[in-house]
């Protein structure tokens, strides 16, 4: 069986969190939003669990240093979080780049799926 390959990107704002995922070698694109206008938390969590359960491999521009830690935190919280909480984590990652840029990295053994 071929490993599922997925490209992922996140965007964070104080009141909006977005995650876009595209299954490579297919036309399947998934867009998830957590905001006052739309709450895809449950479906995003289910999608990320599907990636985990199917041993997917994810790719992204800054998955190691930014998107991955946000996804990891979201998964650790069981998908029960807010855009504000994810934004605060994103800001902590950005602000730590000069002092301790590895503080928010997720060890490979702690990742819900490969990235």
Q: What kind of feature is each model-predicted range?
A:
Residues 7, 20, 59-60:
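Short, conserved beta-strand segments within well-ordered enzyme catalytic domains
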Residues 14-19:
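Short N-terminal binding/cap micro-motifs at the start of the first secondary-structure element
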Residues 30-115:
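Conserved DEDDh/DEDDy metal-dependent 3′-5′ exonuclease domain
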């Amino acid at each position: 069986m071929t490993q599922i390959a997925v490209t992922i990107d996140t965007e964070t704002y104080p009141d909006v969190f977005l995650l876009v995922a595209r299954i490579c070698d297919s036309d399947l694109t998934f867009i998830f939003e957590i905001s006052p206008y739309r709450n895809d938390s449950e479906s995003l969590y289910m999608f990320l669990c599907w990636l985990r359960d199917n041993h997917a491999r994810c790719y992204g521009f800054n998955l190691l240093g930014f998107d991955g830690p946000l996804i990891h935190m979201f998964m650790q919280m069981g998908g029960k979080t807010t855009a504000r909480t994810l934004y605060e984590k994103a800001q902590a990652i950005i602000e730590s780049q000069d002092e301790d840029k590895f503080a928010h990295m997720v060890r490979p053994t702690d990742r819900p799926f490969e990235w």
